[in-house]
Amino acid sequence: MASLGVNIDHIANIRQARRTVEPDPVPFAMLAELGGADGITVHLREDRRHIQDRDVQLLRQTVRSRLNLEMAATQEMVEIALAVEPDMVTLVPEKREEVTTEGGLDVAAQLSGLTPMVERLQQRGIPVSLFVDAETTQLEACRNSGAHWVELHTGTYADASWADQPGQLARITEGAATARHLGLRVNAGHGLTYQNVEPIAAIPGMEELNIGHTIVARAVAVGLQQAVREMKALIQNPRLDPLFGHALG
């Protein structure tokens, strides 16, 4: 059964839209945990467009579940991670012009630069996950980097038409199986919603789903604790679809 990591970046987005002090994402992380979140995820971007350094520092002190720090593979971010010591670091690609992360990290092309970063973090006892597309070449490179975890990019599945979703789901399912065969542990995330999460949650060996925007959007109507409860219920008990043999979207 997959666990739920709640990404609270979008709480910080609201704050930064007015360059003010509220809403503070730190107490919202506590509410997410009260709603059943198994972990809290934040992305400290190089441009600090939403989550700020003080958020990460305070979250490290207050999160009672697990703190997953998403960050670019840069020396600055590695130093921050070593100082904060989150429960996990997820290395992700970044482009300043993007609204949100647009694809997986090209580990195969960046292996020589990523490997020493992975090694340095893991030597300090910080598990490292690499956010990648479900491609064998990338997954093999992840294994070669020394990382023990991958987070499979689900954006293409989330953006696919109804007719194309089964094919995208099969690709991610095969990627998860390949990752496990390589000795990697598997998380997934990006673009998952209340409508499409169940098939991903039903993938064998899926350990954690990191979900943010849809939960924060739902929270506007029902509150964050209830929004988290609803998402966790879908992940824990995905319904089966008799047509495709996987969970209903």
Swiss-Prot record:
Disulfide pattern: none
Domain of life according to the entry: Bacteria
Active site: 43 (proton acceptor), 70 (proton acceptor), 190 (proton donor)
Binding residues for 1-deoxy-D-xylulose 5-phosphate: 9-10, 45, 50, 100
UniProt-listed Pfam families: PdxJ
Metabolic or biological pathway, per its Swiss-Prot or TrEMBL entry: Cofactor biosynthesis; pyridoxine 5'-phosphate biosynthesis; pyridoxine 5'-phosphate from D-erythrose 4-phosphate: step 5/5
Residues reported in the UniProt entry to bind 3-amino-2-oxopropyl phosphate: 7, 18, 191, 212-213
Task performed by this protein: Catalyzes the complicated ring closure reaction between the two acyclic compounds 1-deoxy-D-xylulose-5-phosphate (DXP) and 3-amino-2-oxopropyl phosphate (1-amino-acetone-3-phosphate or AAP) to form pyridoxine 5'-phosphate (PNP) and inorganic phosphate.
PANTHER family assigned to the protein according to its UniProt record, in alphabetical order: PYRIDOXINE 5'-PHOSPHATE SYNTHASE (PTHR30456:SF0)
Protein name, per record: Pyridoxine 5'-phosphate synthase
Lineage, highest ranks first: Bacteria, Bacillati, Cyanobacteriota, Cyanophyceae, Synechococcales
Gene encoding the protein: pdxJ
